[in-house]
From Swiss-Prot:
Transmembrane segments: none annotated. SUPFAM superfamilies: Microbial and mitochondrial ADK, insert 'zinc finger' domain, P-loop containing nucleoside triphosphate hydrolases. The gene is adk. This is Adenylate kinase. One of its GO terms (cellular component) is cytoplasm. Consists of three domains, a large central CORE domain and two small peripheral domains, NMPbind and LID, which undergo movements during catalysis. The LID domain closes over the site of phosphoryl transfer upon ATP binding. Assembling and dissambling the active center during each catalytic cycle provides an effective means to prevent ATP hydrolysis. Some bacteria have evolved a zinc-coordinating structure that stabilizes the LID domain. Keywords: ATP-binding, Cytoplasm, Kinase, Metal-binding, Nucleotide biosynthesis, Nucleotide-binding, Transferase, Zinc.
Length: 214
């Protein structure tokens, strides 16, 4: 049986675990994980004009403007091999991004990681570290690297993101809640929205998503 082309989205506030779920999913399926955050960090790493602009916005807990985000995401989708489709991580976040996406693509299903305890989420983020080379994500509470301060994938140093602090997390959560409601409502009305508790075991979260893969 030939695999079909799946077009998925995963939504959720910062720290809900979108990246972790998607990376584990991509290891066991042919779905390509497309994270807007990774695209931003790659642009920042390249020190391009867009990258410097993005760095300034993210450091203050804001979101990158829609035009830049749309450009980076769509260019990735149209210029990279996607054998069984993709899962978009953290995109779209605004109505303008949603309008752009609807012109370009038809989405099959949307998974929303729901946060029921903000304090628990803040604790999770306070203990998050990333690889400064390949952007792999770890958590010092429940997903530690095999070697302290060293990435399992490339052995590079692990660092804490500048925006992983309580004040910025709260600011990003407030902004997320303000902007996500129209996105949530749109996909809910289309009967394409599946909500998943972000504090469930990862195996259960993955099982829920995998049942929709064609």
């Amino acid at each position: 049986m030939v695999a079909q082309f799946n077009k998925f989205i995963i939504l959720g506030p910062p720290g809900a675990g979108k990246g972790t779920v998607c990376k584990l999913l991509s290891k066991t399926t042919k779905l390509v994980h497309i994270a807007s955050g990774d695209l931003f960090r790659e642009a920042i790493k390249n020190q391009s004009v867009i990258g410097r602009k993005i760095a300034a916005i993210i450091s203050q807990g804001g979101y990158v403007d829609d035009a830049t985000t749309n450009q980076l995401v769509y260019e990735y989708i149209t210029t990279n091999p996607l054998p069984n489709g993709f899962i978009l991580d953290g995109y779209p976040r605004t109505e303008n991004q949603l309008d752009f996406l609807n012109i370009k693509l038809t989405i099959d299903m949307v998974f929303e990681l729901v946060v029921s305890d903000l304090n628990k989420l803040i604790t999770r983020i306070d203990n998050r570290v990333i690889c400064n080379n390949c952007n792999s994500v770890y958590n010092l509470l429940f997903q530690k690297p095999l070697v302290e301060n060293s990435c399992d994938q490339c052995s590079a140093k692990l660092v804490k993101r500048s925006d992983d602090n309580k004040a910025v997390v709260k600011a990003r959560m407030e902004l997320y809640q303000q902007t996500i409601q129209p996105i949530h409502t749109y996909f809910f009305n289309k009967q394409l929205l599946v909500q998943i508790d972000c504090f469930l075991p990862l195996e259960e979260q993955l099982k829920t998503i995998k049942q929709f893969i064609r």
